[in-house]
């Protein structure tokens, strides 16, 4: 996908990654010009026409002509996701991604056409893409079910979308907004559209999701493709403990220490000695003790805690 190029390549480029390589499979036996252009404009230093687990392996392990990388990011099918999972540790990855998920949280302020369109718009991703609607309006729930059937008759990708909706679709009717919020936080979906009379309340109280799309003017397609927030997002309830891909994913922190005075070496060493003995680590304690002896002038018996 063209959007995936700027979601991954451009993010790495903004982070200052010194070597960015990108790949996409051929289309009709040729490089896809729009994807290649997006990769190039996003800042890729090397572009390869390949996809699938072979591309993942080439990037992570290296080949005769491709130097291995330190991190893999970007979307793919179930095989690509599994390859990234198995390679995690050898290289870093963005996240463990499953099938895309979409949820709409709605009330009487919107109509069935919007709800059905937004549910099916993401259900066409694949036959196993979950789509859920949470509402406190029974009429809207019934009308949306009817509208889904109508749209499936004219949607070119209806074979895929209908399979997703039939096998992974949920229509959840709640009594209150508080109950809707609780269900949504528990499900922790990737994409969550909120179209209610209290969108900001949901923004303040939602805590488990990939990305929120607030108000009827906003939708997942615009968010994933155009608005600018990253569409590499957590699925399968991973939104409970992590967020999506961002510039910080390509950055890492390091620490260093230096003790510069004899007094500091003695003070820190005495604390360290006592703590290490308390934990049962004599070897650790002696790292502290030897410095207390040298820089503090104290004669601490071997293997004992400093006073």
Outline where the language-model segments fall.
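Conserved small-residue-rich beta-alpha loop and adjacent elements
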Residues: 1-37
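Conserved NAD(P)+-binding/catalytic subdomain of aldehyde/semialdehyde dehydrogenases
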Residues: 41-130
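Short acidic loop-to-helix transition motifs that present clustered carboxylates
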Residues: 27-31, 50-58, 199
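C-terminal core of ALDH-fold dehydrogenases
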Residues: 177, 185-307
């Amino acid at each position: 996908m063209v959007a995936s190029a700027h979601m991954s390549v451009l993010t790495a480029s903004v982070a200052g990654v010194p070597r960015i390589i990108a790949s996409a499979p051929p289309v009709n036996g040729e490089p896809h010009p729009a994807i290649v252009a997006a990769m190039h404009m996003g800042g890729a230093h090397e572009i390869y026409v390949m996809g699938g687990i072979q591309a993942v392996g080439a990037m992570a392990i290296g080949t005769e002509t491709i130097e291995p990388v330190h991190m893999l990011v970007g979307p793919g099918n179930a095989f690509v996701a599994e390859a990234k999972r198995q390679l995690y540790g050898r290289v870093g990855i963005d996240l463990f991604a499953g099938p895309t998920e979409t949820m709409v949280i709605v009330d009487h302020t919107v109509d069935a056409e919007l709800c059905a369109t937004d549910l099916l718009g993401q259900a066409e991703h694949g036959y196993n893409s979950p789509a859920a609607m949470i509402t406190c309006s029974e009429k809207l729930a019934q009308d949306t079910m009817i509208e889904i059937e109508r749209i499936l008759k004219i949607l070119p990708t209806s074979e895929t979308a209908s399979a997703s909706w039939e096998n992974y679709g949920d229509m959840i009717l709640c009594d209150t907004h508080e109950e809707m919020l609780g269900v949504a936080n528990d499900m922790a979906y990737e994409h969550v559209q909120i179209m209610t009379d209290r969108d900001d309340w949901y923004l303040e109280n939602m805590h488990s999701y990939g990305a929120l799309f607030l108000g009827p003017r906003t939708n997942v397609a615009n968010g994933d493709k155009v608005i600018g927030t990253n569409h590499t997002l957590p699925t399968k309830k991973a939104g409970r403990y992590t967020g999506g891909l961002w510039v910080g994913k390509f950055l890492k922190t390091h620490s260093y220490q230096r003790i510069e005075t004899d007094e500091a070496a003695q003070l820190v060493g005495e604390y360290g000695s006592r703590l290490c003995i308390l934990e049962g680590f004599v070897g650790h304690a002696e790292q502290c003790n030897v410095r207390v002896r040298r820089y503090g002038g104290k004669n601490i018996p071997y293997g004992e805690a400093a006073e």
